[in-house]
């Protein structure tokens, strides 16, 4: 079976469409999604529509946690918008009650067994969805991440692609679909073959010019939202 590993979509439907087109061409059977479907950018409804066509497993990210808190706390929502832009507010406005409830009820972490492989899907680390596991993690942290006797651990949150191997465990961060931070343009994901146990970190080019302009119009006070999409 071929699995697409992806996450940190952040309401960027253009980037997600590019990844899903590539996944279709690669004959992917199933998506494993590390959370943060919403936040930062402005098309959460389209993101959910695109994902609805696929067999998928999804875990909660920190932006889904923000979404849940923002639904009942206007002051917290205002704080989120000041720091991260209007992505969470737009999700509350665009999505129906069922969609919002499902996003806010996503699990973390999620244990799966696929083709005889034990897989752990998480957002930050296996023990904390808001813990950052960067590519330069030290050996002690690497051992802790791989201590659960899994064949594959998939995580997100940092927006940096990473691939490590310790013993029989593959530890992978596919990078961010919607907002990569490693100064290479494009939408990041990974392709995993359960039969051969091979993994490929991939990046798909897409036209982000309309989204960049939208960021500049909506949030001139937050230049980061557009600048991060243009880093090289």
Each language-model region and where it sits:
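Anionic-ligand binding region
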Residues: 135-164, 169-172
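Short Pro/Gly-enriched beta-strand edge/turn motifs at strand-loop
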Residues: 92-95, 99, 145, 170-177
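Active-site-proximal beta-strand elements of phosphoester/diester hydrolases
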Residues: 2-10, 118-125, 171-175
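Active-site environment of divalent metal-dependent phosphoester hydrolases
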Residues: 10-15, 39-42, 63-69, 129, ...
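Core catalytic region of metal-dependent phosphoesterases/phosphodiesterases
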Residues: 2-97, 104
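Active-site-proximal segments of metal-dependent phosphoesterases and phosphodiesterases across multiple
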Residues: 78-82, 115-148, 180
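Acidic, His/Gly-rich catalytic cores of divalent-metal-dependent hydrolytic chemistry
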Residues: 165-232
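Short acidic-hydrophobic surface loop/beta-edge motif
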Residues: 108-116, 164-166
């Amino acid at each position: 079976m071929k699995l697409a590993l992806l996450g940190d979509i952040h309401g960027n439907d253009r980037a997600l469409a590019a990844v899903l087109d590539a996944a279709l061409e690669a004959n992917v059977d199933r998506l494993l999604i590390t959370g943060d479907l919403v936040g930062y950018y402005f098309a959460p409804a389209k993101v959910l529509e695109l994902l609805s066509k696929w067999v998928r497993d999804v875990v909660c990210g920190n932006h889904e946690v923000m979404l849940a808190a923002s639904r009942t706390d206007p002051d917290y929502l205002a704080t989120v918008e000041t720091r991260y832009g209007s992505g969470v507010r737009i999700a509350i406005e665009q999505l129906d009650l069922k969609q919002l409830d499902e996003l806010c009820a996503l699990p973390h972490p999620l244990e799966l067994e696929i083709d005889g492989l034990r897989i752990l899907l998480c957002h930050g680390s296996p023990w904390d969805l808001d813990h950052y596991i960067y590519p330069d993690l030290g050996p002690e942290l690497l051992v802790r991440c791989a201590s659960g006797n899994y064949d594959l651990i998939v995580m997100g949150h940092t927006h940096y692609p990473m691939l490590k191997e310790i013993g029989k465990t593959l530890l992978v961060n596919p990078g961010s679909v919607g907002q990569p931070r490693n100064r290479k343009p494009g939408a990041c994901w990974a392709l995993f073959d359960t039969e051969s146990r091979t993994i490929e970190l991939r990046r798909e080019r897409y036209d982000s010019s309309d989204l960049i302009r939208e960021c500049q119009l909506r949030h001139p006070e937050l230049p980061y939202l557009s600048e991060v999409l243009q880093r090289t």
